[in-house]
Amino acid sequence: MSSPQLYYRLSARTHATPLRDSVARDVVHLLNCAMRGASMGMPSDAPVASSVLNFGNPCMATLGRSRVDPQHIANSIRQTLAAFEPRLLATRTLVVARQDTDSPGSRALYFDVHGVLRHQGHHIAIRLVLDYLGGFFEWIQERP
């Protein structure tokens, strides 16, 4: 049996960091996948709408829209996480468009995702950047 001192030397951060990194990578992958159903015109309450066959983020290109709405995209991100990321509690997930998003000439939008991991109860914070001309998300990793 191991010594109890070893238990106290292990920090919660060492366990939470790899899990947070894994969730962050998977969130970026999820958001960079496009829902197939968005282009097929299926009803949103159809069972396939939230199945793995329709995995991903809804299409952000909408006909007739010339302005990018960060709040609309933040809501879309939250709904995608609620549907397809089971490690985050959907009721405790918040996606916020950062204020520096609307700088003139910028082609990037910044989002902060705050959530709670379902089984461990740890808070998780992920910073994302969306290059909306290229149409892809990236994870902004914090420097140690």
PLM ranges: what are they?
Residues 111-117:
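A short beta-strand signature
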Residues 96-111:
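Beta-rich nucleic-acid/ligand-interaction surfaces
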Residues 54-100:
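Acidic, low-complexity glycine/serine/threonine-rich segments
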Residues 1-65, 117-144:
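Immediate N-terminus of the mature polypeptide
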Residues 18, 22, 68, 72, ...:
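Charged, alpha-helix-enriched surfaces in structured cytosolic catalytic cores
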